[in-house]
Amino acid sequence: MPIWRFNGNTWSPNGPPPSSAEPFEFQTPVDMSKVTAALWPGQSRGGYKGHGGFRFDSSDADSMIVRAPVGGPLVQAARYLEGTEEQVLLFFSVPCGFFYRFDHVSGLSPKIEDALKVITGPATNDSRTTFMSPPLWVEQGEIVGTSVGIPPSNIFPNNVIPNPAWADSFANDKEFGHYGVCFFDYLPSEDGDLMRSLPTGKEGKTSDYC
């Protein structure tokens, strides 16, 4: 299966990409019955954020199974410190051309934990990624981690697809900032509708994508 790479200007696969099913739909990566609020993608939250996320009560964060929403290889990862808490950032490349990411995920599955042994750190506020060599394939529905977050416990999936209209908003982040989608649209319909109905952060239900 091809891996998508960024050359500083554009994304391209290292082989012929497969077509995706229409409509393209993810498996919801977490138990929606435990989600207490939604963070909408494409809004300012201490700076512009192209990603959104799920929020959980802290009592659930230590027992939250996180599953891969679609099959694809883990291609980049980072370990970093936020305060005194170690955080893990994971990037997955879906063969048909999507990227998604998880941040603040912990209790990693054994095979992902083993793959991340090549990463040095963690370092405070340094989330620069390491490319996985070789990439690690993770099947749809496979467990990625078993807990999430720092208070107030968030996990952030970031789905990447061309959206040139907003490129100027992300002048310093050509790799991911020029691309984004409303990930609610790619969840099973009932879960996407629930995300839209849940309470939000102080920024509310504003989004350049949704």
PLM feature spans:
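Zn2+-dependent peptidoglycan hydrolase active-site motif and core
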Residues: 69-131
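Residues in well-ordered beta-strands of folded domains
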Residues: 55-57, 103, 159
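Short linear motifs in intrinsically disordered/low-complexity regions
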Residues: 8-10, 15, 32, 155, ...
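Surface-exposed, glycine-biased beta-strand/turn segments
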Residues: 1-89, 93-96, 137-143, 179-180, ...
